[in-house]
Every structure is written in C-alpha cells, then in structure tokens.
Curated annotation (Swiss-Prot):
Any single Gene Ontology cellular-component annotation: small ribosomal subunit
Keyword Kinase: no
Family in the record: Belongs to the universal ribosomal protein uS4 family.
Annotated PANTHER family: 30S 40S RIBOSOMAL PROTEIN (PTHR11831), 40S RIBOSOMAL PROTEIN S9 (PTHR11831:SF5)
UniProt function note: One of the primary rRNA binding proteins, it binds directly to 16S rRNA where it nucleates assembly of the body of the 30S subunit.
HAMAP family: Ribosomal_uS4_A
Keywords carried by this UniProt record: Ribonucleoprotein, Ribosomal protein, RNA-binding, rRNA-binding
GO molecular function terms noted in the UniProt entry: rRNA binding; structural constituent of ribosome
GO terms, biological process: ribosomal small subunit biogenesis; translation
Source superkingdom: Archaea
Protein name per the record: Small ribosomal subunit protein uS4
Assembly information from the UniProt record: Part of the 30S ribosomal subunit. Contacts protein S5. The interaction surface between S4 and S5 is involved in control of translational fidelity.
Length: 187
C-alpha cells in the first residue's frame, strides 16, 4: 500500500565529528558571509570541492595519455564555472582551491556582488521570489552555479517590479552600491 520509497543519493557528506569548535565557527562565518541558511549548504560546497580535489589527486598519479585528457577536461569544467581563473592551470592549482572559491560562483553571491541586492540574504530572497533572471530565464535556486558566460547576463526578471528604475527598494540598493564605490575609491 502506498507509494514505493523514493531512493535518492545525498549530495553532501556530513562532518565526521559533530562537535569540533573550530569547524563550527568556520562554517558559521561562511554562512554569515555568503548568506547561507543551513550548514548543509556549506557541506554541499565542500563535497563539490572534495570531488574535484579527489579527481586531481588521481590524475597526478595517472601519467597516461588518458590521464592528460581527463586533466584538460577537468580544467575546462573549472574554467567554465569560473572556479579556476588561471590561464595555464596545473593539477596543483586544483588542489589549492578552497570552499570559498565554490561559494563565490553561486547565483546568490553573484547577485550580491553585482549590486542587485543590498545583502546576501536579500539576494537569496530576490532569487527565491523569482525576481532574478539569468540569460532571460528566471532562476529560483540560490545555489545555482553560474558559468562565466552567464555571469554578465544576470539581471532582474522582466516581470519583476524591481525591473522598474523607480522602484523604491532599487533606489536604496543603487544608493548603497554608490556609497561603497566611493569609500573604495577614497582608500
């Protein structure tokens, strides 16, 4: 009776030990800096990074022609998402990546960095409520990984009230961005 159980694979790995103070503080700081709602989002980013680093370690030991092809493919994927910004990367560059490199490529972070929102939390709210479009298509997932090609195409959605230049909240956002650029220029 009832529907069959839906089996799914977890997209993250939890920490081995739940109560390590340094890890908890580091995760809390990442959640605050990037406007994440749960530590699970940090764990997902760590799992993505772990996957790339594991592949790089395997390719360092693999000296065959196939290993070289796979290394080039890994570099292309990381460059496509803007995680690896170096022109001629090596596998050591992949091993030196951090969780912040992954979190910087989330749509939520890029909306905040582009000045479409005042805070990372507001960026998340705008995305979830359907006010942000990527390449003309509304994206409602704050964890959406933005490619380098799509980065310039992030904007307010066509049907969003934020698309109007006279929207009062948008005026606050633009004013805040102008203040930040002035303080950076004076420094």
């Amino acid at each position: 009776m009832g529907d069959p159980r839906r089996r799914f694979k977890k997209t993250y790995e939890t920490p081995n030990h739940p109560w390590i103070k340094e890890r908890i503080e580091r995760e809390k700081e990442l959640c605050r800096k990037y406007g994440l709602r749960r530590k699970r989002e940090v764990w997902k980013a760590e799992t993505i990074l772990r996957k790339y680093r594991r592949q790089a370690r395997r390719l360092i030991s693999d000296r065959t022609e196939q290993g070289a092809k796979e290394a080039v493919q890994l570099f292309n994927v990381l460059k496509k998402y803007g995680i690896l910004k170096i022109e001629n990367p090596t596998l050591d560059d992949v091993l030196s990546l951090t969780v912040e490199d992954i979190l910087e490529r989330r749509l939520q972070t890029l909306v905040f960095r582009k000045g479409l929102a005042r805070t990372p939390r507001q960026a998340r709210q705008l995305i979830v409520h359907g006010h942000i479009a990527v390449n003309g298509r509304v994206v409602t997932a704050p964890s959406y990984m933005v490619t380098v090609e799509e980065e310039d195409k992030i904007s307010y959605a066509k049907n969003s009230p934020f698309n109007d230049d006279n929207h009062p909240e948008r005026a606050k956002i633009v004013g805040l961005v102008a203040e930040e650029t002035q303080t950076q220029e004076t420094e």
